[in-house]
Design a protein with these regions (language model features):
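Phosphate/nucleotide-binding beta-alpha loop and adjacent structural elements of enzyme active sites
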Residues: 1-146
Length: 146
């Protein structure tokens, strides 16, 4: 049981309701944890990760790379599985990066956050920022590079 009030959570998910930003307390293998959510999109993402269990966890993951971390929900999933897990997060959006750091306050020493994008190429970028931050993207400004 992840949510303390499952029926209220289902209602909020279906009707995209609830007040934001808000702090959500939830049950994890390490006990009670909390996360800051900033939109109903964040709440929906939280439910996909924590309730639908989109990630396979086998108690072997010690180092996690979270590329495009957004506000850190995926990283928090891994950090709440084991006290031995360390997460390296990469998030280029300034707004999301600040939210991510706030969400990691309970995990000092177990995460490393970088305000950077990750690519196999070096290029100047244009950030396409979407209001919730869930659908942000990066575009190469040099049209001669693929």
């Amino acid at each position: 049981k992840v949510h303390k009030s499952p029926f209220k959570s289902i209602f909020n998910e279906i009707f995209s309701s609830g007040e934001y930003p808000r702090s959500l307390s939830f049950n994890s293998p390490l006990g009670e944890s909390k996360v800051n959510l900033y939109s109903c999109d964040d709440f929906s993402t939280f439910n996909l990760i924590f309730c639908r269990q989109d990630y396979l966890y086998r108690n072997k993951q010690k180092i996690i790379l979270d590329i495009g971390s957004n506000i850190g929900l995926s990283s928090i999933f891994w950090l709440t599985r084991s006290k031995d897990t360390v997460v390296h997060c990469y998030e280029p959006s300034t707004e999301n990066y600040e939210k991510l750091k706030k969400n990691f306050q309970d995990f000092v020493g177990r995460f490393f956050a970088f305000k950077k994008a990750v690519s196999s190429k070096n290029f100047s970028t244009l950030h396409n920022i979407e209001k919730s931050g869930v659908y942000n993207s990066i575009r190469n400004l040099n049209k001669n590079q693929n």
